[in-house]
Amino acid sequence: MNHQNYHVKKQVNQEKSHSNYINRYNRHNCINKDNCGNTCRISSKRKSKIHKPIHYAYKSIHAEETALDKIKLQRSKKTIKASLLVIRLKPASTPESYSLANSRPCLACLYRIKNSANNGLRINKIYYSNDDGKIICYKLKDILSEKQHLSKFYRISVVPKEYVRYFGINSPNVSDSSDSEDSRDED
C-alpha cells in the first residue's frame, strides 16, 4: 500500500466517524414558515458539520443557520414575513417515543435571525422546544430583550466581542473569574 494513500484513507475514515458521531448526537431540526402557513424550508436531513471558516473559532452549524442559508432571497424582492420553529430531540429518542430537549437559539443564531431582514426575510416569531418537552413561542423583539442563552460552545469558550456589544452580556469566562476572586476575598 502506498504510504500517501494510507494517510488520505485514514483521514477520510476519521472524518466519516466524526460525522457519524455528530449526526448521532445532534438531532436538531428547523422549519421556516411564511405568513400564509406554507413551509418554506426544512433542514432536518442536513448533516451537522463543523464550520471551519468562522473568524473566531470552530463551531458546528446550527439548524437555524442552515435554514437561513437555504433561503436565498434577492434584496430586490418583497420582504417575506416568517416564523421559525426549532426543535431538538434527546439522543435517547426513538421513532416510537421521542422527548424534546432545549433548543433555544444561541447568540450567533439570534444575531443571524435578527439580521436576516437584510436578505429579504423578516422573522417575527420563534418557536423552540425546552427541556420540559413543551414548545415555547416568543416574538423576536421579546427574546432579544431577555437574558441570552449560551450554547455549550459559548460556555466553554470566549464569547465574540460583537455579540457581547450587540446583546449587552458579559463573557462567561470573565464573570467566572470575578466571582472566584470575590469568594477568595471573603475567606
Curated annotation (Swiss-Prot):
GO molecular function: catalytic activity
InterPro entries xref list: Cytidine_deaminase-like
Name of the featured protein: Uncharacterized protein R197
